[in-house]
Amino acid sequence: MAGSSSSKEIVDAVEKWMAFPTSGGGGATAGLEIVAEDAPSGSSGAHQQQAWRPVAPATAGRDSGGTGSGKSSVDGGVGRASHDSLPRVSQELKDALSSLQQTFVVSDATRPDCPIIYASEGFFTMTGYSPREVVGRNCRFLQGPDTDAAEVAKIRDAVKHGRSFCGRLLNYRKDGAPFWNLLTVTPIRDDNGKVIKFIGMQVEVSKYTEGLSDKRMRPNELPVSLIRYDERQKDKAMSSMTEVVQTVKQPRGARAPADAALLTPPKMSDADKMAAMSPVVAPGTPSGGGGGAGSFKSPLWDLKKEESRLSRLASGRKSGRSSLMGFKIGKRSSVGSREAPAVVEEPAPAPPPAPEVVERTDSWERAEREKDIRQGIDLATTLERIEKNFVITDPRIPDNPIIFASDSFLELTEYTREEILGRNCRFLQGPETDQGTVDKIREAIREQKEITVQLINYTKSGKKFWNLFHLQPMRDQKGELQYFIGVQLDGSDHVEPLRNRLSENTEIQSAKLVKATAENVDDAVRELPDANLRPEDLWAIHSMRVSPKPHKRNNPSWIAIEKATNLGEKIGLKHFKPVKPLGCGDTGSVHLVELQGSGELFAMKAMDKSVMLNRNKVHRACIEREIYALLDHPFLPTLYTSFQTPTHVCLITDFCPGGELFAVLDRQPMKIFREECARFYAAEVVIGLEYLHCLGIIYRDLKPENILLQADGHIVLTDFDLSFLTTSKPHVIKNSTSLKRRRSQEFLPPTFVSEPSTPSNSFVGTEEYIAPEVITGAGHTSAIDWWALGILLYEMLYGRTPFRGKNRKKTFYNILHKDLTFPSSIPVSLAAKQLIHGLLQRDPSNRIGSNAGANDIKQHSFFQDINWPLIRCMSPPELDVPLKLIGKETQPKAKPDEDVPLNLDTF
């Protein structure tokens, strides 16, 4: 009992530290609210809550019982308003909404039962109901016997309190057929903050969700599925919802969406797949070339060219961290204008922004879009972006079940992910499947060896296809069997009738392709933690001891840490006294803490274990811990210790009293730096990135929020949860000298270059800073960090990023296609524009830094006044608004000897 009590005390202590209130049923969706122009007469919160209560089932063709649904007829049934009293929407709004491709409804929150006042065409197609059966009714008619009542309760609670919601629940079509619906609910408020409408966006995810398979557990109590898909789908849904919300807010500004191909990757025929033998990670032009059949592709691969345009809106923006903290940093402008393609020597003319435009802030842009636009996004691992037919099975679980299936495999076989996760692959067999070939596969599994065979398999509908199947075992670092990788290739179009099998030449070429795919899958899976690890072993690296590195081992912080460890205790949460919160992100928080009895201040990053598990970020957290342990550089943070609690993992690093560069930039006149200041900060970023690349680290999340300022004004790059760690490839480039230099006996020394050796293809980064090759899925190298440097320099000089759009899809389109322009209203040197232009080359091979790494950039004329070897000894240029240091003294005064409590309301 004593042990149990002690454990409870630990958990309670952790909860007191870290139990930040969530944003409601919708998690990250709570920020998606907008302010409308006009405020109709309102209704009480009770009416809104009532809108989501289940009613007795009465729909024809639907099984009775369970959660039930309302009537589908247009009579005066439950939840049905009379036809004459139905709320109306303006024709202008109808026209604007009809241009959207999303499936959604708009409900009137000011009327009892929140009746639907508009439903998109996609909603009728998805559900099978007619407009007459939908408009004027509450959405509960989609519920049925197996709809999760707990999820419905979450929706009801979100509606009652005027919050957003995003979750997956089982709904039913008019004919009674069930489908998985990813529902996103967002409130629309009037100028007084009262909810007047709700938007409910539906995305059918039956094909790709794990469904009830997420309840299947391994012996280690972790899910059978290697990837958790719900959070992936929620992230995509939230991005799509922004366009709907913006259209409701500003119907006049709505335009017909681009072609559907914007969101649909090109499908290749199997003949093309077998004919194209390019490697899976291939260099290519971000505008669409270089992909080949073997390239990674993303949902935005085939973006089509359209007229480049910028909205002439001004918008405020907030730091990704500070917006969640509630800090009032001030307004930032984002003024765009239609400009000609950028010519560095002669920047296109642009009218100077009018003061009233700069100061005006649109409610959506300022209050909602800003809450997530600067957050790092993690949309897919490299494994998920391999567009080939393959599965991964785990032989350590009985019956060797499937733990991962690619989207392409689902398309080929017609099965849903829910139907195959946790099952053995034998469901593909049928009447004409050769049992002798099946026996060969079974023997290869027993002997743990690879094999390539061809056999007849069957889709879910019974259609047979010739499957060129490659089985390859995957072993861990100890050489023990970990997984099997099974790659399929449909060769039905290449079967020779007389031989009743694939032609010899096709078989040879196809075998090469499936083996290459298996190798790429093998590499990609190794980025993820072993699914068979015990939960406590997942975080083992955070309990490892941290040893001081040479350059900082004698600084006061390390002396204080070692003094504490010399007492024989392992440092943990109890050794630190909370001072105040510094920031909060989507997976954790950062606190200013003091080491008990030392007076030394540190930054503590705390990450919620359950959130990391649900969002497929365990490997990200472990890689970040591994990277921190490698660093020993004045422009990078020092890791002093790390530990875990029952609910969190924590990193103790340097506290930077200068705060984020973002906040410093925001306080400057016009929200920009003078060029000498921008040059200094950019130069130190180059030095930091050069060091990271030398260690084999691709940073992947450079932005002002992740650049902290030390007390002396020098920078520290922080946050490595999206970084990629591989090996580096050092080499020396001999510089050729000109005749003039040879005559004067001035010889250039050789150049040392060390860049990460292995490309990656994870879809990670921050929306405005993501490089084109990340979006297209062509595979990326450390060159993406130099792209981000170009965006950073542009933002420091112009107060905005060059490719930002009104939503994520538009931003990504701009990154791939929009011309780079330089507003003439802000004076910037030609050298700066040339450097930005060179860094923002869409083809990575043409980008400055792609050949000799940081050396290319350091030699640019923009940095000619920088003394690179002595930059850490330089005094930073004076800012127009001086650096304001933060620390214990900035906390509101407390009584003597009284601990300053954490203000949990900040989160």
Swiss-Prot record:
Q: Which keywords annotate this record? A: ATP-binding, Chromophore, Flavoprotein, FMN, Kinase, Nucleotide-binding, Photoreceptor protein, Receptor, Repeat, Sensory transduction, Serine/threonine-protein kinase, Transferase
Residues forming the catalytic site? 701
EC number assigned by the record: 2.7.11.1
Q: Which domain of life is it from?
A: Eukaryota
State the needed cofactors, names only. Answer: FMN
PAS domain boundaries = 89-162, 375-448
Q: Where is FMN bound in this sequence?
A: 138-143, 156, 171, 181, 202, 424-429, 442, 457, 467, 488
Protein kinase domain boundaries:
576-863
> What triggers its expression?
By white light in dark-grown seedlings.
PAC domain: from which residue to which, for each copy?
A: 163-217, 449-503
Q: What does this protein do?
A: Protein kinase that acts as a blue light photoreceptor in a signal-transduction pathway for phototropic responses. Regulates a wide range of physiological activities in plants that maximize the efficiency of photosynthesis, such as chloroplast relocations, stomata opening, and leaf expansion.
User: Where is the sequence biased in composition, kind Polar residues?
Assistant: 41-51
- Region (Disordered): which ranges? 28-84, 332-363
The catalytic activity, as recorded, is: L-seryl-[protein] + ATP = O-phospho-L-seryl-[protein] + ADP + H(+); L-threonyl-[protein] + ATP = O-phospho-L-threonyl-[protein] + ADP + H(+)
Q: At which residues is S-4a-FMN cysteine found? A: 139, 425
| Cofactor mode of binding and number, as noted | Binds 2 FMN per subunit.
Q: Name one GO biological process term.
A: phototropism
Q: Where are the transmembrane segments?
A: none
- Show the SMART domains listed in the entry: PAC, PAS, S_TKc
Give the originating organism: Oryza sativa subsp. japonica (Rice)
What is the protein's name according to its record?
Phototropin-2
